[in-house]
Amino acid sequence: GDFTIMKLTDKTKDILEWIICIVIAFVLALLVRYYIGTPTIVKMPSMYPTLKQDQRLILNRWCRTIKEMPSRGDIITFEAPTSDSYIFSKDFNPNDVAAKYSNEKTKALDKFIYNVLEVNKASYIKRVIALPGEHLQIKDGKVYINDVELQEDYLQPQITTSTENCPFYDLVVPENCVFVMGDNRPESTDSRRFGCIPLEKIESKVWIRFWPLNLFGKVN
């Protein structure tokens, strides 16, 4: 009868309201994750001892949203360059020192899945060493910016910066790019191998470490 129809209608309405609430919550979560910030886990040892494997971080993505230029010393995450583009020979074009990305998406849905949902997207976490227009040199295990030695207190005392099998060790950083390296230089694949990272490929700045709790605080 009419009562049964009304009951079904009310039930359907409740279900629809729940579905709408879930969809809205999902969209809001995506927006916050993409534009403002998101948690992540350190998976590789390339930033040791500053960041250790399995530590939990909060990434600041607002800097990407407002297209803020990172500062030297900032720890950032960025889309990993195409792996088959890494150069291991010293024969390279000195005027072409930006990292290569060959998996650019053209369709809107593919862009959404890759950039927003981050399906099959690899990211690296490294420290910004040199900025646009700066002359970077690595010699005798040390880093020089515009002929001035860079003081790197975040490195372990015995660590030096090798250029073995690394073509990118004497270059001028292009406009809208940064040169990045891991703090654990012997265990880091970074700009020495794949070149400078375009600003448009930077995803976030490391902001807070929230695990382990005894190390909770801002990351420098």
PLM region descriptions:
Residues 5-16, 35, 49-220:
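Soluble "head" domains of membrane/secretory-pathway proteins
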Residues 31-45:
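Aromatic-capped interface at the extracytoplasmic side
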